[in-house]
Amino acid sequence: MARVVRIFKTLRNHWKKSTVGFCLLAYGSHWLYGKHCDNLLRRAACEEAQVFGNHQILPHSAIKKATVFLNPAACKGKARTLFEKNAAPVLHLAGIDITVVKTDYEGQAKKLLELMEKTDLIIVAGGDGTVQEVITGLLRRDDEASFSKIPIGFIPLGGTNTLSHTLYPERENKVEQITEATLSILKGETVPLDVLQIKGEQDQPVFAVQGIRWGSYRDASVKVSKYWYLGPLKARAAHLFSALKEWPQQHQASISYLGPAERPPEEPEQKPSRPPLYVRIYRRLALYWSPPKVEVPVEPTPEPWEEAQLSAVELSITTQNHQPDLLRTLDSMSIHIEPDTISKGKFIQLGAQKMTDPLLHPEDSQVLLASRCSLHLPQGTEGHFSIDSEEYEAMSVDVTLLPRKLHFLCHPTRKQELLQSPTATAQS
């Protein structure tokens, strides 16, 4: 008893040291508990993956091959460690023959995709920029018609993982997010996503699954990291200094666009069986003896292009992938024109909100739906675009919607939500 009293006296006499020690002990306990929970998540994911690996392979069947494009520089250089600790063991236990391709510099994934051999599965381990590079390299291939049918998996390892909100349920824990995404790849459920083809006057086309941004909010967002010392106020500070440097901020251009297009019928997944020999012979003879058909020339109907002059604080052209509707009958991309009549205070407030939700737009924005559009910038225009969070020089571009071009692997529950009506999907 005397010893306990002596301990309490010591803590009372040295209360400053005791407080610091208690805080360190509490933080250390919380850190160790977090590590323990992460290990439990990894173990559960590996046990679930082993169920896939225990399935017997039929005779003369090949092992499923997957090519992983890993960006080690993503997530401030932590992507490689995150992949090797959380995703790689799950893929190995599932019995998949994986080939990991690590990119060393920006743009390398585009070149590697042009040389890639046939694979059963493509996995992108990185962020928005890595996804943009991989799909650009994939769709630039001469045989892109066949390679674009390969399912694509996405493991969110980057600083910005916009696509993960579409493919997987929201998760706060990073380890749980990665392991759940990897397990979703093994389950094989896919969702078709639209792609934007962005073509300049001379350059090769660039492809995006999210969209293109041009304007003041984009310019201010790339400078937020300069004000890291302001902590949670850094986003507001970047937009404040942007407003003080130049106001009003106007981006003028002209845009011509073609309205939404009818969704073509889906191609059957299984090819129809070949008809019997006598049916094929009869068809050939009927075709041979039938008189030649006279083709009546049909004049092509002019496409109803519309034009508009814009003066905006920001322009964005985005796909519908943030909330895809698998039951829609019209295919379109969204063109958001945000008015330049906004006040400085509203500009700073909305800019800070856009850092967490880039798809946020003011209520008075003009929204156009189009299947194709041409953006014409005035000669001498400076600045940059953001295409799926990657920076490109601003120039006049033609943007074409490629509906349901690529198939991404997703979580089964997300697939069920997307197959419901739009109202039910929005409420979930």
From Swiss-Prot:
Gene3D superfamilies, per the entry: Probable inorganic polyphosphate/atp-NAD kinase, domain 1 (3.40.50.10330)
Residue ranges of domain DAGKc in the record: 61-202
Top-level taxon of the source organism: Eukaryota
Record-listed E.C. numbers: 2.7.1.107, 2.7.1.138, 2.7.1.94
CDD domains: GATase1
Localisation: Mitochondrion inner membrane; Mitochondrion intermembrane space
UniProt-recorded Gene Ontology molecular function terms: acylglycerol kinase activity; ATP binding; ATP-dependent diacylglycerol kinase activity; ceramide kinase activity; D-erythro-sphingosine kinase activity
Catalytic reactions of this protein: a monoacylglycerol + ATP = a monoacyl-sn-glycero-3-phosphate + ADP + H(+); a 1,2-diacyl-sn-glycerol + ATP = a 1,2-diacyl-sn-glycero-3-phosphate + ADP + H(+); an N-acylsphing-4-enine + ATP = an N-acylsphing-4-enine 1-phosphate + ADP + H(+); 1-(9Z-octadecenoyl)-sn-glycerol + ATP = 1-(9Z-octadecenoyl)-sn-glycero-3-phosphate + ADP + H(+)
GO biological process: ceramide biosynthetic process; glycerolipid metabolic process; protein insertion into mitochondrial inner membrane; sphingosine biosynthetic process
Membrane topology: Peripheral membrane protein
Region (Hydrophobic) residue spans: 18-34
GO cellular component: cytoplasm; membrane; mitochondrial inner membrane; mitochondrial intermembrane space; mitochondrial membrane; mitochondrion; TIM22 mitochondrial import inner membrane insertion complex
Sorted UniProt keywords: ATP-binding, Kinase, Lipid metabolism, Membrane, Mitochondrion, Mitochondrion inner membrane, Nucleotide-binding, Transferase
Cofactor entry: Mg(2+)
Pathway entry: Lipid metabolism; glycerolipid metabolism
Class of enzymatic activity (EC top level): transferase
InterPro entries: AGK_C, ATP-NAD_kinase_N, Diacylglycerol_kinase_cat_dom, Lipid_Phosphate_FormReg, NAD/diacylglycerol_kinase_sf
Subunit structure, interactors included: Component of the TIM22 complex.
Function recorded in the entry: Lipid kinase that can phosphorylate both monoacylglycerol and diacylglycerol to form lysophosphatidic acid (LPA) and phosphatidic acid (PA), respectively. Phosphorylates ceramide but not sphingosine. Phosphorylates 1,2-dioleoylglycerol more rapidly than 2,3-dioleoylglycerol. Independently of its lipid kinase activity, acts as a component of the TIM22 complex. The TIM22 complex mediates the import and insertion of multi-pass transmembrane proteins into the mitochondrial inner membrane by forming a twin-pore translocase that uses the membrane potential as the external driving force.
Similarity section: Belongs to the AGK family.
Designated name of the protein: Acylglycerol kinase, mitochondrial
Source species of the chain: Xenopus laevis (African clawed frog)
